[in-house]
UniProtKB/Swiss-Prot annotation:
Primary gene name: fluC
Summary of activators and inhibitors of this protein: Na(+) is not transported, but it plays an essential structural role and its presence is essential for fluoride channel function.
A Pfam family: CRCB
Segments traversing the membrane: 4-24, 35-55, 62-82, 95-115
Family according to the record: Belongs to the fluoride channel Fluc/FEX (TC 1.A.43) family.
Catalyses which reaction(s): fluoride(in) = fluoride(out)
Organism lineage string: Bacteria, Pseudomonadati, Pseudomonadota, Gammaproteobacteria, Alteromonadales
Name of protein: Fluoride-specific ion channel FluC
Positions of Na(+) binding: 74, 77
């Protein structure tokens, strides 16, 4: 039951971060492309790589993993919003933007998970 509380606490932090980052990206870049979702997915993927690698080289408590991995990063990143925004781009006739959104979200996020892992592994 304790882990549920850690997930809830981490999730509340991740959700607020996602909201604030999305607002900032909307102010900076406008609404022509879903940069907010892209940024939170890249940031969350990088941090997931770091947490995964830290778990490989050191002992992370189940509470810490629940707080960060499931709670905070689970709420920070969003596949459903990414999918909806991509579909909206397609429905509005922006096929190139939609394909770009998929390629960048998936490709960059996989790459930054790797970078996060390598950052930790190079230090241990």
């Amino acid at each position: 039951m304790n882990n549920v509380l850690f997930v809830a606490l981490g999730g509340s932090i991740g959700a607020v971060l996602r909201y604030l980052i999305s607002l900032l990206m909307l102010q900076v870049f406008g609404s022509g492309f879903p940069f907010g979702t892209l940024v939170v997915n890249i940031l969350g993927s990088f941090l997931m790589g770091v947490i995964f690698a830290l778990g490989q080289v050191s002992e992370l408590s189940p509470e810490f993993k629940a707080f960060i991995g499931v709670g905070m990063l689970g709420a920070l990143t969003t596949f459903s919003t990414f999918s909806n925004e991509t579909l909206l781009l397609m429905q509005q006739g922006y096929l190139v933007k939609a394909v770009f959104n998929v390629v960048v979200n998936v490709g960059v996020c996989i790459f930054v998970v790797y970078l996060g892992q390598q950052l930790v592994f190079s230090r241990f």
